[in-house]
Amino acid sequence: MGTVKELAAAIRPLDKQKIQAASRHVDGLIKPTNSLGRLESLAIQLSGMWGLDRLDNLQKEIIVMCADHGVFDEGVAVTPKVVTWLQAVNMQKGLTGVCVLARNSQTSVLPVDIGIDGEPIDNMLSLKLSRGSGNIAQGPAMSRQDAEHLLLASASLVKQRALEGISVFGVGELGIANTTPASAIISVLTDSDPHDVVGIGANLPQDRVQHKENIVRQAIRINQPDARDAVDVLAKVGGYDLVGMTGVILGAGACGLPVVLDGFLSYAAAIAACQIAPEVKSYCIPSHFSAEKGARRALEHLGLAPFIHLDMRLGEGSGAALAMSIVSAACAMYCEMGQLAQSGIELPVPA
């Protein structure tokens, strides 16, 4: 994984033979064909990932990228910037929404300081290059060199955690004002008008959404990101957390392991990751349909259909934490259900 190009090249297609064998296995379970719907297709998808030798006893972890954004200074958020640092402390203590939901699904949470504008947090893993990204309304979020460095560092973190036993990754984020750069990324990479993408984020009043949209337009106009080059887009109108999430997605794919997406921020990262390495889409598992305005446009571009519709927009990886239970259910179905051939039951073949 010495370069982003090498990282992308390490992502292999799913194993077609394993998928065919898994499909036969699922069709032979004690149930009518396709009666467990998308649980069946999820189990088959997981079976085709070369990094998973088996689907039982999977160890799950959500990596949460925490960072601040210079564009906060443009008045695009109502929550104080210090809340990023405060919530990162709470996350490190296991008190935030993602931590509670992850515990419920037997999933660990790994917060990472990838650019918080604050003092180091005790015992928190750090990949930080600086305290917050640049203000995208005035110039680039970071240099291309820094973006590539953090993509590779985040992917290397995934590889390390995989070697330590993690077999299912989730991705999350924490950063006040980060829906602004996410909206810019989605607007550029999906060729969408910002009006169709920019939403309220963390409860921005409706009368300020137009200003936020104007800031996204300004960021795109000033930085002129190249829509054919996702790394350029991340560096110019993204942020450290978004780059880190993209690296986690690419890293999981390079390890042949699944990565469960979260909401709006993760859609932006996934769109970037899929442009860098189209094969990585096969390793992405959608979780929930974010309530953020641009969610539908982003998901349509990705061609992914979320499992969960709960009007959530917390972020942090909270949707990924919920979806981990669905991943576990698909694996339990695959590994623990009996086979029709041994049951004495004969079912009609569907027309």
Label the model's feature ranges.
Residues 1-351:
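N-terminal loops that bind phosphate or other acidic moieties
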